[in-house]
Amino acid sequence: MASQIQKLLTTNQDLLLMQKGTMMRKVRTKSWKKLRYFRLQDDGMTVWHGRHLESISKPTFSISDVERIRKGQDSELLRYLVEEFPLEQGFTIVFNGRRPNLDLVANSVEEAQTWMRGLQLLVDLVARMNYQEQLDQMLREWFQQADRNQDSRMSFREAQRLLLLMNVEMDEEYAFSLFQEADVSQSNTLDSEEFVQFYKALTKRTEIEELFENFSSDKQKLTLLEFVDFLREEQKESDHSSDLALKLIDRYEPSENGRLLRVLSKDGFLSYLCSADGNIFNPDCLPIYQDMTQPLSHYYINSSHNTYLLGDQFCGQSSVEGYIRALKRGCRCVEVDTWDGPDGEPVVYHGRTLTSRILFKDVLATLAQYAFQSSDYPLILSLDNHCTWEQQKTMAHHLIAILGEQLLSTTLEEQLIDIMPSPEQLRGKILVKGKKLRTIEVVESDKEEEELEKDEGSDLDPASAELDMQSQPESQEQASGNKSKNKKKFLLQSSTTILCPDLSALVVYLRTAPFCSFTHSKENYHIYDISSFSESKAKNLIREAGNEFVQHNARQLCRVYPSGLRTDSSNYNPQEHWNVGCQMVAMNMQTAGSAMDICDGLFRQNGGSGYVLKPEFLRDTQSSFNPMKPVSLYKAQILVVQVISGQRLPKVDKTKETTVVDPLVRVELYGVPEDTKQQETSYVENNGINPYWGETFYFQIQVPELAMLRFVVKDYSRTSRNNFIGQYTLPWTCMKHGYRHVSLLSKDGTSLHPASIFVYTCMQEDLDMDEP
């Protein structure tokens, strides 16, 4: 693949023009538009820009950091500048994670097309690289960085600089001995092939060699039977382990003769352990593997709070980009706060703050385009409506006109009224969640009508409560006097009606309802009534009535949202709300941190569909489960985690070439309160390339079905807080035991390949302190 890129750099016309460089306009805001010189570097993997051709600057971004290229027509920012620049001359570079997009305007349509085609070609090539090809590319980049005089050879001084780039501080005498061993030509320099041998010596995996030799009778190879023993005893691959061993040998043994003899060499063994088959995340959990035909209330649903915000809650930017990013992350419930806007057009923003505004119809157009790109399971549009009657009519018109057949506007045929539809039944549909005027038939089935309370938005926003009071349906006493009238008509209210029937009619299965008590909800609400809770209210209910909360959530949906005091868009721990079966635990997805890592970890499974089936005891309306007083169906288990080693950890501060990390690993367990705990290794001084810890931890787990495991690697600091290096979070139910690699992710959730840690995990019935 790497050679293919090098070939394309000399033959592809788009890439040739990109290597010559192009002056383009970089656009950050409506007023910030600067000319910059962009050029694809000779390695074909990095792009830099400067004020002019002679600018001295480092590469601005790597092709591996780019997710996709968008046309100018799809850029919210460039559309605002259509009178200044033709949209056909613009394009957007979309990066992985939360890194801001890069909007560019070329001097001509042809120039824009050249860069769009060329960049997308390289992005697609990188996406198809396997582990070895990615490693080859990384080695090539390191060699080029170390070869300061560009003579295609590396001196020992350049090799010393490389060690610092690779995040390792090594004794000079030992480093020189490795350098001499690799210098087969005895020229006191290394060519590219000799450099590969130098790299292998630097990254020698002694711990894996020892593991290999423990199962190999001749210390040179694993026979088929020896490999089967390893898979069965250590990797817990008890089912069809013989067939699996054959497949893995065919897949990872580099020697054709070894494959014919059905043996695995040391290199093949290492390739297996570093592959997806040797990863801690069970590959069987990556596609859709759960039953998707159960009622919506039986699933955790990946949910976003104030989806339109890219920053804080007070003066942050509102943008349709927030919806695109959330949907890209697998979000299946987005929030839309609507307010009256100019020219009769509703706008979306965080009301009574300084956040910017976007048009409601632009949000809908974005949802129509991106709703089902990452998941085709139903998308819930959580509507927080603050508009007047007239603009609500406009909202209803836009919902129907823009979303078209994607919008679920009527109940499903042959769907029982007392059972919520399933994700499978609702595939490809957008559901509106919001307030709904009640019909006489519904009122008659209710024992009483309660005064509506505030149920959505910020804890500090009185407007919602005011709206709810105004849109309150008439009391049961008033309703009884109207029984002779047409039952399909909406009820008149004692005060001026605020909620528009046109908009109300589009709320089909997801009607918001104020929460009074669990008893009231059970006796008065239907399965399609949804109550919303602030995080603090939900926490109180969990502490005071955990089991009732579990039963409530087995029967109907609920939504939890962050406190309005979180003006910085920080997040709360979703785990404690999942523990009682809350389905829609809304997160500020624009904010990285441990809370979002836990959220991403849960929804990484099941095809990234945004729907995860809750454990059986959280789907039973008669469940006796209480997370505050868990009684395990089985004997408490012991999770054993041995943190063995780390590989190619990135620098915390890449601008400081001479600094090297002192890494440590913290293992965090999240679940019911009794299971939540963490343990930490000691730190390894000055080694980011192959640190070794070899420390073992024991975690007692009462409710493994709810447990989440998070590995965090940090750079130890004596004077301040330890700096974040990388992390990986996964559900206990998706964890493969045995010797596994944990692929690290950045704060933004993007891959830090090839950075990883090597661990051993297993489950024990009784606490046995012997080393695994």
Curated annotation (Swiss-Prot):
Residues 503-619 form the PI-PLC Y-box domain. Induction: By serum treatment. Residues 446-459 have a biased composition (Acidic residues). The modification Phosphoserine is found at residues 445, 458. Disulfide bonds: none annotated. The keyword Acetylation does not apply. Its EC number is 3.1.4.11. Signal peptide: none annotated. Pfam families: C2 (PF00168), EF-hand_like (PF09279), PH (PF00169), PI-PLC-X (PF00388), PI-PLC-Y (PF00387). Residues 26-53 are annotated as: Substrate binding. A motif (GBA) lies at residues 213-243. Substrate binds at residues 433, 435, 532, 559. Present at high level in testis. Also present in brain > skeletal muscle > thyroid gland > stomach > thymus > aorta > heart (at protein level). Highly expressed in regenerating liver. Isoform 4 is weakly expressed compared to other isoforms but is expressed at high level in some neural cells. This is 1-phosphatidylinositol 4,5-bisphosphate phosphodiesterase delta-4. The lineage of its organism: Eukaryota, Metazoa, Chordata, Craniata, Vertebrata.
